[in-house]
Amino acid sequence: MRKAINPPNAPSAIGTYNQGIETDGLVFTSGQVGIDPSTGQLVDGGIDMQAAQTLKNIEVILSSLDLGKESIVKLTVFVKNLDDFPFVNEAFKNFFNGIDYPARSTVEVSELPLGALIEIECIAIK
């Protein structure tokens, strides 16, 4: 059985999807971008600010299930420019801050929704 996850304090989905799905002890988030939930707009700044906000948005989705960032086992990161990889690494370092890093893949793409510079999908365990 699967359960849709759409917490009210996370950014609203910009398409026909749920923010996440919980099934059989696993949580899968849809791709998140650096939208500020209070404005519905991408945060100002570059890749570093968008990466930080994207990770916060994932944290909000997980916290709606009483899960923390330590439950994250895999992240798939999509960036518009692989030259931004060091900024993504720094955002991850700040976000995970002493917690073991999850597995991760990073892929360069030509475009992302809303002109975002980064999008992240998450798999977590309950």
What are these regions (language model features)?
Residues 2-126:
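Short, polar/acidic, helix-capping and beta-turn segments at strand->helix junctions
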